[in-house]
Amino acid sequence: MTESTFPQYPRLVLSKGREKSLLRRHPWVFSGAVSRLEGKANLGETIDIVDHQGKWLARGAWSPASQIRARVWTFDKAESIDIAFFTHRLRQAQQWRDWLAKKDGLDSYRLIAGESDGLPGVTIDRFGHFLVLQLLSAGAEYQRAALISALQTCDPDCAIYDRSDVAVRKKEGMALTQGPVTGELPPALLPIEEHGMKLLVDIQGGHKTGYYLDQRDSRLATRRYVENQRVLNCFSYTGGFAVSALMGGCRQVVSVDTSQDALDIARQNVELNQLDLSKAEFVRDDVFKLLRAYREHGEKFDVIIMDPPKFVENKSQLMGACRGYKDINMLAIQLLNPGGILLTFSCSGLMTSDLFQKIIADAAIDAGRDVQFIEQFRQAADHPVIATYPEGLYLKGFACRVM
């Protein structure tokens, strides 16, 4: 396409001196950087982003109601945002996942990790021959038809299921959507394979897209710590860590979650892998309350896995989240036998690794115990982090030895 025949997009003009992040190829433009919009753009529509002198910087999606006013699709002026664009992005992403799936023997993985795969606001997880789609931003929703068409071109044998039923869409005035897009309806529970485990995934009703693929490598790493140990698995969801602990030879694993449905699937996962169900206990309870009750009754564990949901959605909640992480990790440290292992995680993007490490150190001081950091975790390799978007590193964790 020549420049003379190129679509004419509305122009988002930045204030003087506010182009630096785009020159470093960061994919967001915040409201404070915007001078004006030239032309009319509907919610999610494609716009050109220029500096205060009109110099072209990037092409992105317009989000007038969001603090992130524009999310960048491309830094290449020659790229039009159309089906061919999405097809190219999908094929780029698929190359890495194909290699990874072959090396690690995976049938399920994250195909698109938003900004880090050049598709801001788009999450796509593959479970067997099902593609589960989440559109989290106005731009992603605006391009829904083009994206689905590109998916059908790249993966014609896959069924597509929409799980855009996430509250963040409401912030931009978008309805929550869920249901089949193309192909067959996923079964109530779909079996997948991960590092020798068989696991049941609830695509239609489970958390997020149905399963936390980002913790795959951490679940495998758990096995080295658990042989002949008593394990407490907090916020267990459907028991991925529990199954891995049993495969690692633990003496007992106690899984705690507030959802009975999740615990029922966890039990089925233990049975599916033909593991000793007598070594697995499933407790429906609030983790904070249960840890305090365990402390009062003198319960002790050798390994504790702490994988809570996101405690912080925005900067105003960060201090409260820090207190929550500190409290729950202090309780865990107090419940560990000397020499015990704490595997603790945060999936809050605003929580940096350095801050999380400091919180664990403060929790250890409050618990009156010494703690050694012995291993560090992050999201699995199918959840890449592009160098210019450090916010993409949202999952962090530590293995700690408690003295």
Curated annotation (Swiss-Prot):
Pfam families: Methyltrans_SAM, PUA_3. SMART domains: PUA. This is Ribosomal RNA large subunit methyltransferase I. It is found in: Cytoplasm. Residues 9-86 form the PUA domain. Its main location: cytoplasm. It comes from the Bacteria. Keywords: Cytoplasm, Methyltransferase, RNA-binding, rRNA processing, S-adenosyl-L-methionine, Transferase. Transmembrane segments: none annotated. Its EC number is 2.1.1.191. Specifically methylates the cytosine at position 1962 (m5C1962) of 23S rRNA. It catalyses: cytidine(1962) in 23S rRNA + S-adenosyl-L-methionine = 5-methylcytidine(1962) in 23S rRNA + S-adenosyl-L-homocysteine + H(+). GO terms for molecular function: RNA binding; rRNA (cytosine) methyltransferase activity. Belongs to the methyltransferase superfamily. RlmI family. CDD domains: AdoMet_MTases (cd02440), PUA_RlmI (cd21153), RlmI_M_like (cd11572). PANTHER family: RIBOSOMAL RNA LARGE SUBUNIT METHYLTRANSFERASE, S-ADENOSYLMETHIONINE-DEPENDENT METHYLTRANSFERASE DOMAIN-CONTAINING PROTEIN. NCBIfam families: PRK15128.1 (NF011707). One of its GO terms (cellular component) is cytoplasm.
